[in-house]
Amino acid sequence: MTVLPFLFPAATPGLVVGCFIVNLFSPYSLDLVFGTLATLLACLLTQRMPNRWLAPLPPVLCNMVIVGAEIAWYLVGFGPGFWAAYAFNAFTVGVGELIACVILGQLLLTALPKVPVLRPFIPERRLANI
């Protein structure tokens, strides 16, 4: 979903609020702040990507770095095991985001511009990059 701001910048507030609501049910209380921050940052950066092939990059990197660190801190704190836990969690979050954002995201970025009712909401500069 965080690739949507590439086509629809107005989707950013809805994605951020939706992330916050979902994070209310997270076992990690810090997810309310950091998970939502990762989504906001990913959406804002995705809006600025020059083409659809780079659009999945911000969500993958933001979540990998921010959420990976959050989970590592939650599991082991900032003690000696933090960096090992961070490497593992950043990798696993990154792989999950890569699958979701690249594969499913590209499907969305291909299909949505073809829906006639949605085309008026896509900026012209984006339609040229599809």
Where are these regions (language model features)?
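Generic transmembrane alpha-helix motif of multi-pass integral membrane proteins
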Residues: 1-11, 42-46
